Amino acid sequence: LKDWTFHSFADAGENVCVLTENDEYILFHSPPNGIGILKSPNLKDWKPWGELITQGQKDWLWARGRITAGTVVNLKHVSGIEHYLMFFHGSGPLKETEGDFDKNASIGIAWSKDLIHWQWPVN
């Protein structure tokens, strides 16, 4: 781990989380707002996959400013859960540029069976 070789660049923001699924790598990252997904067969060549995930942001005062830092855990093999779980950071009601990022922050949860379609608590 002392010497690294640069192979490529993917515009992936920050706060990355990588899962392996069907011999592919799926990277969740934080663009300016929302949670992006990239897919790779080899950890070098990354392509966008799916839509930008913003969950129910338009309806959530607590996350209207920004959604970021999605971390996904594969619990599909756990009886009674059988989903992927995503934990993410939300800030609001103001945008980060308006000074709300560190003052009003919350953690959200969502779940999915396929990493594309997500559900979250209504209340």
Language-model segments: residues:
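Carbohydrate-active catalytic/glycan-binding domains of CAZyme proteins
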Residues: 1-123
